[in-house]
Amino acid sequence: MNSFTAIDLSQLPAPQVVEQIDYEQILAERKAYAISLWPAEEQAEIAGRLDMESEPLTKLLEENAYREMVWRQRVNEASVANMLALAKGTDLENLAANYNVKRLTIQKANPSAVPPIPKLMESDDSLRERAQMAWEGLSTAGPRNSYIFHARSADGQVADATAESPFPAEAVVTVQSALGDGYAPPALLAIVKAYLSDDDRRPVGDRLTVQSAEIINYQVKAKIFLLTAGPESELILKAAETSLLKFAHQRRRLGLEVSESVVHAYLHVEGVRKVVLEGWVDIVATKYQAPYCTLIDLALGVE
């Protein structure tokens, strides 16, 4: 795995600026304040009228409370749009620009191809992490994390990178591709090497080698035993497969470990009693290797 240890943004506490919005509470507060505007001797009558849904004043306060709820939600959304941990889409792109980092293109669109090739852009998670690493790029590519940051910024097809120095004045950068199984083709390696070899990035004394990650293919074959048998069995099986696919298709990493306990955790969705993996061997990838799931084969277990 690479040596850069970013703050786990998902573990940050919920920001206080984001408030929980309750329409009924807003409406009750609106009614209470409206009642207080009448003379004390008339407030009981007004309160009784506001308890009636057909009362025009009630409708007016309901509309007003709804508008306030919408406004508060807009304030919430504007607040999180300015937080690196929570921003998405173009809001995140504008935040990343503060670090001189932009979203990269993984694959250019080609509508004339058969079938048409869609445009693929860097994911929010990848862009967010590169923004966190931006300070590493202030140095030339001598330090390990600086090499990693610049390698990941060289091209949108770079999903992950590691950097090691097996001998003095020698740097080996390993690249994992965002396309296919993660193997980096020679063309991508040439782009990364040219980018890293820029006089403003690579120290003069470094001998640079850029290589592709070694891909470790693995399959998941499992028997899924359910709490109860019934018509929902296929739905539970599909939910387990979807859950495991979420893990298998997460942002690609070099040195990722795929352990039996992790697979069990993702397959144990609601309704699953027991999981039995067939022929499983834990995968512990080195910093030069990347696991890639080629098959998920789930079947209902019978006892």
Where on the chain are the PLM-derived regions?
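Carbohydrate-recognition loop of C-type lectin domains
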Residues: 136-256
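N-terminal polar alpha-helical/low-complexity "assembly arms" that mediate subunit docking
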Residues: 1-140, 235-303
